[in-house]
Amino acid sequence: DRQKTLAFGVTKSISEGFMKMRINRFLEKYAGGRIYFAVNNTRQLLEEINTMKLDFAIVEGNFDKNIYDYIVLTKERFIPVCAADYVFKKEIACLEDLFEEPLIIREQGSGSREILENVLGSRNYTFQSFRSVMEIGDIGITKELLKDGSGITFLYEMAVKQELKEGSLKEIPLRDFDVCHEFALVWLKTKHFYDYYQKLAEELKTSMSEPEIVKNTQI
């Protein structure tokens, strides 16, 4: 149906690397119709699916598998990150060593925040275990704060791929922190549309696996 609106969303973490995943090529197949594309945190995207504003979303946060059908697209590393020249209060070897550093976290409803909260909780820690906590809802601002040496954070390697490559940010090596999480295409549970979303998922996987095209242009 070329007139049907394709309404979908991705989380803020995923949107940071989503254009690099060749989303344009995926969307080209639906250029004859209308597209509604949203970027929000996991909680808000799931609410928009519930109210039928979105057909599906790509999320990294947790969701109720009794309510939603899903297809796993990929699994991504969740890593501690800081500025390349960040000066730590002490030698860093394990997660507990970071507690003397200021922590930057995402807003309530963020899948990234929930994952970090769960990891800390499994070890009987909380955000308050850190020296100070700053809550920022924008990943771009978070990156700038990191580059300025304002603290450390935990996020998906994909979201800072460029910064890690260029050397403005670095992964903090920890001997006791090895976390990966699934990115999934999620929609309201129904037996009628699984084949349709399975096809979408395969198209997305293909787009995500295509190499980035570097253009020699100045912006």
Q: What spans do the regions from the language model cover?
A:
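Central regulatory/effector-binding core of bacterial HTH transcription factors
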Residues: 3-66
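Flexible hinge/capping segments at coil-to-helix
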Residues: 67-108
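A late-sequence structural motif
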Residues: 18, 170-213
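Immediate post-signal peptide segment of exported/extracytoplasmic ligand-binding proteins
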Residues: 1-6, 96-100
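Short, well-ordered beta-strand segments
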Residues: 5-9, 57, 81, 104, ...
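Hydrophobic hinge/microswitch elements
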Residues: 41-45, 50, 60, 125-171
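Short beta-strand->loop
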Residues: 69-79, 165-179
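Secondary-structure junction motif
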Residues: 103-124, 194-195, 201, 211, ...
